[in-house]
Regions:
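Catalytic cores of nucleic-acid ligases and guanylyltransferases
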Residues: 1-314
């Protein structure tokens, strides 16, 4: 099956805005997925090219049932907790690699498509976004677990207030006349209701009291080629997460800290900086540390070397 470049990514926005030349979509709290079909060959891949198909057999079946048999579409795989997309709930499917076991999890998943990169042998990436979204809507039947990502035109500030009031993660603003570029671009902008950050896990502290497996994660981000320490995270774990993540950490242990020179916790244990987590937090301190961080889940779709501190763009 032919490959395409990595997916287009959004930059972090400083504040919501309204503009008739932009469209605004709901920011879904899931994992990015590229859906491909060439004849009978159907696949889902992550933004790093990892095969996601075994974890989501019902999505593969739904894509195979579409009349269209030649496409590349961009979207997000999500699970719901009530009316909210839940990255935490999706964790129960992300790490299951056997299709039979994936079905037994009883966690329904959905694929929300928002862009069409190729259709019927034609490359659409140079077309304006509005034209691509129009083609996407016509190309798929959007029944069952495959769904269309709706958008609003122009009134971004009002839509953002509504999104935050509903408990959504935020919005993605997209320039309506923009082409699809396989990079991070200011033509797509993330507008977040809360604050989240992807961070590299590079160590942990021993458990205390009744806690088992580990106490807190030691996390950081890359800056100027070095791994910068961003603090420790001791909340957001249930018993199962502590056990599963603890086993992963033990397998990655190394003797020396991978962080650049910093004031690091005593008695810490270090791991190869390969695992990437998603974390919620209240703010950054002046010295580049997280305030009130909480673990949301592991990200298997992000290389550790690409993790940098997200800074709002004006």
């Amino acid at each position: 099956m032919a490959k395409t470049g990595e997916p287009m990514k959004a930059k972090l926005g400083a504040a919501p805005f309204s503009d008739p030349d932009w469209v605004f979509e709901r920011k879904l709290d899931g994992i990015r997925a590229i859906a491909r079909r060439e004849g009978d060959a159907v696949s889902l891949t992550s933004r790093t090219g990892k095969n996601l198909s075994p974890s989501y057999p019902e999505l593969i079946e739904a894509l195979a049932a579409e009349p269209a048999d030649d496409f590349v579409a961009d979207g997000e795989i999500v699970a719901f907790d009530g009316s909210q997309t839940s990255f935490a709930k999706l964790q129960g499917r992300m790490h299951v690699k056997d299709p039979r076991l994936a079905r037994l999890t009883a966690i329904p998943v959905f694929l929300y498509l928002f862009d069409l990169l190729r259709f019927d042998g034609h490359d659409l990436t140079e077309l304006p976004l509005r034209a691509r979204k129009g083609a996407l809507r016509r190309a798929f039947s959007f029944h069952g677990p495959v769904r269309y990502t709706a958008h609003r035109n122009e009134h971004g500030e009002r839509f953002f207030r509504e999104a935050c009031d509903k408990g959504w993660e935020g919005l993605i603003a997209k320039r309506a006349d923009s082409a699809y570029s396989h990079t991070r671009s200011g033509n797509w902008v993330k507008l977040k209701c809360g604050r989240e950050q992807e961070l590299v896990i590079a160590g942990f502290t021993p458990p205390q009291g009744s806690r088992q497996h580990f106490g807190a994660l030691l996390v950081g981000f890359y800056e100027d080629g070095e791994l910068r320490y961003a603090g420790k995270v001791g909340t957001g774990f249930d018993h199962r997460t502590l056990a599963e993540l603890g086993a992963k950490l033990e397998a990655l242990e190394i003797p020396e800290p991978p962080f650049a020179a910093a004031d690091l916790p005593r008695l810490a244990r270090w791991v190869r900086p390969e695992l990437v987590g998603q974390f919620a937090f209240s703010e950054w301190t002046r010295d580049g540390k997280l305030r009130h961080p909480s673990f949301l889940g592991l990200r298997e779709d992000k290389p550790a070397q690409e993790v940098v501190r997200e800074r709002p763009e004006a």
